[in-house]
């Protein structure tokens, strides 16, 4: 009987917290696969010439393609949106569950088949060695003749459907299921970030679906959408892909903004500085994200006027981003800061995300980008905002909320060891890439001239440090989950909530908090609210 109940609970779950837990477990599993791929990349690049991959350039490209897809679609998005989003959005707005609980279930269960298809694509024929952009003509039937690219396309379709359904669910939930008195301008910033992200997904994913479906018919049904021989244009694919691809990078980072806002507010023991400005900054970033896509295509032969516009528009995004950075700093300023692991990750996020943003402003210049496009400078830039922005935000959220999710508090010592090893590791890995890029080392090539050896060796050494940090994290997770259940306080950070601009009442208790999750037990009951909470 136990077995059947367990199977029913986890396979057919309609409970947002259980589904959020499934997403988190899935993303940790996928993240380990993606990390393994990244280590293969760095080991191959540890020296010039052939190291590990038999001089097989196709295999190298299959690995970087899989690394990108897994890290984006199966680590960051499931963890932030699926994991923390499903777990905390209903709790934070005082809703009993998501609006469509069964839709929520299939949103999760579309992801494992998608991951299997993606990993499977690497094992048939020569693999999909296209890079995550899947540009034709390289991805066309002439240059990738097997079924690999088709499997990767189906994988993307499934992951896309999953995200779309999840987004519909989030938008409906946040707009319609808030507790009495919980107006939009009283929502926690994390809920706002999930709402904005869901809208971006809903608007951008259909364009990607159309682009890769046309690629599928080009490959299998002899259409010529991207083939000049039949009146098509491969640049059309680039426009369609990046119209999705650029909002996608904001889809990755905006939930991170939301997490960082919650964490910085708690550990500064102050309300966030400029709440409304933070909301409108996130919304502005979301809108601007849709009108800058061609900055990925400066080298493709666009009109000079077009390039001038995209340069200007891209730089405008730095303004709302700067508003967020300085509002976080203003929150910290004069705060009675509590130095715990989540706070370290949040401070690391601020510093490293800012570096990534500055290199982004450089790359926004069309004239300079002609020199830096497709070099390691670009790799350094987006790994600073992803590997040290999104992932640091993820870990901040993990250490911040793990006690709330499991009822067991993490080990502070190993948490801080994890932070410092990871902080050192990722910087040693990615900072030298700026120098390689400025010297013209191209991306996506497994071999390089001897002159580039020094920085590559340092970079590969950094990836070993990062691996150690990942092992420390997994050990800390093991320590957390294997300890006996402690009676963890509802508000276990003990941050006084009198400063909060949004006091929440639940029942006749006098507990109030900056957001509603801290008035519930740790872990919350299977059905969190027996009666409606009220927002004062």
UniProtKB/Swiss-Prot annotation:
Q: Give the matching InterPro entries.
A: Cyt_c_oxase-like_su1_dom, Cyt_c_oxase-like_su1_sf, Cyt_C_Oxase_1, Cyt_c_Oxase_su1_BS, Cyt_c_oxase_su1_dom, Cyt_c_oxidase_su1_bac
Family designation: Belongs to the heme-copper respiratory oxidase family.
Question: Keywords for this entry?
Answer: Calcium, Copper, Electron transport, Heme, Iron, Magnesium, Membrane, Metal-binding, Mitochondrion, Mitochondrion inner membrane, Respiratory chain, Translocase, Transmembrane, Transmembrane helix, Transport
Subunit structure as annotated in this protein's UniProt entry: Component of the cytochrome c oxidase (complex IV, CIV), a multisubunit enzyme composed of a catalytic core of 3 subunits and several supernumerary subunits. The complex exists as a monomer or a dimer and forms supercomplexes (SCs) in the inner mitochondrial membrane with ubiquinol-cytochrome c oxidoreductase (cytochrome b-c1 complex, complex III, CIII).
**Function, as annotated:** Component of the cytochrome c oxidase, the last enzyme in the mitochondrial electron transport chain which drives oxidative phosphorylation. The respiratory chain contains 3 multisubunit complexes succinate dehydrogenase (complex II, CII), ubiquinol-cytochrome c oxidoreductase (cytochrome b-c1 complex, complex III, CIII) and cytochrome c oxidase (complex IV, CIV), that cooperate to transfer electrons derived from NADH and succinate to molecular oxygen, creating an electrochemical gradient over the inner membrane that drives transmembrane transport and the ATP synthase.
Q: Where does O2 bind?
A: 250
Topology with respect to the bilayer: Multi-pass membrane protein
Record-listed Ca(2+) binding positions: 44, 49, 446
Report the EC code(s) recorded for this entry: 7.1.1.9
- Extract the PROSITE patterns matched here: COX1, COX1_CUB
Q: In which pathway is this protein known to take part?
A: Energy metabolism; oxidative phosphorylation
Q: Does the keyword Magnesium apply?
A: yes
What is the free-text note on the cofactor?
Binds 2 heme A groups non-covalently per subunit. Binds a copper B center.
Cofactor(s) named in the record: heme; Cu cation
Which residues are listed for Mg(2+) binding in this entry? 373-374
The covalently linked position for 1'-histidyl-3'-tyrosine (His-Tyr), per the record, is 246-250
- Protein name according to UniProt: Cytochrome c oxidase subunit 1
């Amino acid at each position: 009987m136990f077995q059947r109940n367990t199977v029913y609970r986890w396979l057919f779950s309609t409970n947002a917290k259980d589904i959020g837990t499934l997403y988190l477990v899935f993303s940790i599993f996928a993240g380990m696969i993606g990390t393994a791929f990244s280590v293969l990349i760095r080991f191959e690049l540890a020296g010039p010439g052939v190291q590990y991959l038999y001089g097989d350039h196709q295999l190298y490209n299959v690995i970087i393609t899989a690394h990108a897809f897994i890290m984006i679609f199966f680590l960051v998005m499931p963890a932030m949106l699926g994991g923390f989003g499903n777990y905390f959005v209903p709790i934070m707005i005082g809703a009993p569950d998501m609006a469509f609980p069964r839709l929520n279930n299939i949103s999760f269960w579309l992801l494992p088949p998608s991951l299997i298809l993606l990993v499977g694509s690497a094992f048939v024929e020569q693999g999909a060695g296209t890079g995550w952009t899947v540009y034709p003509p390289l991805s066309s039937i002439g240059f990738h003749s097997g079924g690999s690219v088709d499997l990767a396309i189906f994988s993307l379709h499934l992951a896309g459907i999953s995200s779309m359904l999840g987004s519909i669910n989030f938008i409906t939930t946040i707009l319609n299921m808030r507790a009495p008195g919980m107006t939009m301008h009283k929502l926690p910033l994390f809920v706002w970030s999930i709402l904005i992200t869901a809208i971006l997904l809903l608007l951008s994913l259909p364009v990607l679906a159309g682009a890769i479906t046309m690629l599928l018919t080009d490959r299998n049904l002899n259409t010529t959408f991207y083939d000049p021989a039949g009146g098509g244009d491969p640049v059309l694919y680039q426009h369609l892909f990046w119209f999705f691809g650029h909002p996608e990078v904001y889809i990755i980072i905006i939930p991170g903004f939301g997490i960082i806002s919650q964490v910085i507010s708690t550990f500064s023991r102050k309300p966030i500085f400029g709440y409304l400005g933070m909301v409108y900054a996130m919304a502005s970033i979301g809108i601007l994200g849709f009108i800058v896509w061609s900055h990925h295509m400066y080298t493709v032969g666009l009109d000079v006027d077009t390039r001038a516009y995209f340069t200007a528009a891209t730089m405008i995004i730095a303004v709302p981003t700067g508003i967020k950075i300085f509002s976080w700093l203003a929150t910290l300023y004069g705060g009675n800061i509590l130095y715990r692991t989540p706070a370290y990750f949040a401070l690391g996020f601020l510093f490293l995300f800012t570096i990534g943003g500055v290199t982004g402003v450089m790359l926004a210049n069309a004239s300079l980008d002609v020199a830096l496009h497709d070099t390691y400078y670009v790799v350094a830039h987006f790994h600073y905002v992803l590997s040290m922005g999104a992932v640091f935000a993820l870990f901040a959220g993990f250490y911040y909320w793990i006690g709330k999710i499991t009822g067991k508090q993490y080990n502070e010592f190993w948490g801080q060891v994890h932070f410092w090893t990871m902080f050192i590791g990722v910087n040693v890995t990615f900072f030298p890439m700026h120098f390689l890029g400025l010297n013209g080392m191209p991306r996506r090539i497994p071999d390089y001239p001897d002159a580039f050896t020094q920085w590559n060796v340092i970079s590969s050494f950094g990836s070993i440090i990062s691996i150690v940090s990942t092992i420390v994290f997994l050990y800390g997770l093991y320590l957390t989950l294997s300890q006996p259940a402690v009676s963890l306080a509802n508000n276990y950070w003990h941050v006084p909530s009198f400063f909060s601009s949004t006091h929440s009442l639940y029942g006749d208790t006098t507990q109030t908090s900056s957001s509603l999750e801290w008035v519930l037990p740790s872990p919350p009951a299977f059905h969190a609210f027996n009666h409606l909470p009220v927002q004062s």
